[in-house]
């Protein structure tokens, strides 16, 4: 029972995918669930709740460590995207039949911001600099609302697969920026309610994400995209996700040593730099790529990366907690 509660979101994602294959009609375009309208409302709701949940007071406490902040933000919005471009160029050499949507999915994964809650929780478990982790994860999410769509356009134009930016910019403002900052402004007026209902706020966001994933897979099932590719493609994507995670993890560890960060800062820098947010990644993908029937393929890398980062980083956090020299003091 405890395992089910702690992994409810991942199980929900799996259930959404299974339901899409079993019953794609209602969630597809033109279906009875009106997914296009529901997804837009859901995107705005998620960003509103993100703004409502963000404590600027706590963020300010960790704002002073510029070397740590530089590493995290450079990895999130510079190194990761460059690695994504490298993947985009090199993977077709060893996987010639790779679907273009998978290539776009890896690029998209690489420009997403960090997670907030799990970065902070894992840093706390490993006895790292929790205040700095909160600052960097929250700051990258604020930047990500602006930078992720811009980087998607910039990198995909370099790769030859961009979409018109004008209509996208209007949707970004209407469905992400306005709800996000409305939530931030409203937070101080409903702070007690938000603090008392944190679990419900998270459940609402997770439910919307599960619905967006369901509708994305419904479209791809209706278009018979999965029949064209199958299990071999899925396994290959998982392999490249593991390679990407391992490569970035190694680069972050090396950079922390070069910058001579102390133990607590290294832990915070690592967790904030290697993690990518599914919570913001799914709604932003719907916003940027929503008209594409192969959206589920674009989401596949981040859907594999998410459980991988939780599992591996959980092991790291427990190991670092046990090897903390202050543990018995």
Where would I find each of the regions flagged by the language model?
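C-terminal hydrophobic structural anchor segments
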Residues: 251-286, 327
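Membrane-helix cytosolic exit motif
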Residues: 247-256, 299-325
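Structural signature of multi-pass alpha-helical membrane transport proteins
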Residues: 1-95, 99, 153, 157-263, ...
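Membrane-interface helix-loop-helix junctions at boundaries between adjacent transmembrane segments
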Residues: 88-146, 152, 156-165
């Amino acid at each position: 029972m405890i395992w089910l509660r702690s992994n409810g979101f991942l199980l929900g994602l799996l259930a959404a995918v299974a339901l899409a294959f079993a019953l794609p009609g209602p969630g597809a375009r033109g279906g009875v669930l009106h997914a296009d309208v529901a997804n837009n409302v859901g995107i705005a709701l998620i960003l509103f709740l993100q703004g409502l949940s963000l404590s600027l007071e706590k963020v300010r406490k960790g704002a002073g460590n510029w070397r740590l902040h530089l590493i995290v933000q450079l990895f999130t919005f510079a190194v990761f995207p460059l690695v994504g471009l490298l993947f985009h160029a090199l993977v077709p050499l060893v996987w010639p039949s790779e679907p273009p949507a998978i290539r776009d999915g890896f690029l998209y994964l690489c420009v997403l911001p960090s997670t907030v809650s799990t970065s902070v929780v894992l840093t706390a478990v490993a006895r790292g600099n929790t205040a700095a982790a909160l600052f960097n994860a929250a700051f990258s999410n604020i930047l990500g609302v602006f930078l992720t769509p811009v980087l998607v356009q910039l990198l995909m134009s370099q790769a030859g697969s961009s979409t018109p930016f004008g209509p996208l910019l209007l949707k970004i403002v209407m469905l992400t920026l306005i709800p996000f900052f409305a939530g931030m402004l409203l937070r101080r007026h409903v702070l007690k309610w938000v603090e008392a209902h944190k679990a419900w706020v998270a459940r609402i966001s997770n439910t919307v994400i599960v619905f967006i994933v369901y509708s994305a897979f419904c479209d791809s099932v209706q278009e018979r995209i999965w029949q064209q590719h199958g299990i071999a493609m899925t396994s290959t994507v998982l392999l490249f996700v593991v390679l990407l995670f391992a490569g970035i993890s190694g680069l972050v560890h090396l950079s922390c040593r070069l910058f001579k960060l102390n133990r607590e800062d290294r832990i915070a820098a690592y967790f904030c730099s290697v993690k990518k947010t599914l919570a913001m990644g799914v709604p932003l993908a719907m916003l940027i790529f929503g008209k594409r029937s192969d959206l589920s393929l674009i989401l596949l890398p981040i859907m594999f990366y998410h459980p991988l980062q939780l599992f591996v980083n959980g092991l790291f956090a427990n190991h670092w907690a046990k090897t903390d020299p202050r543990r018995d003091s």
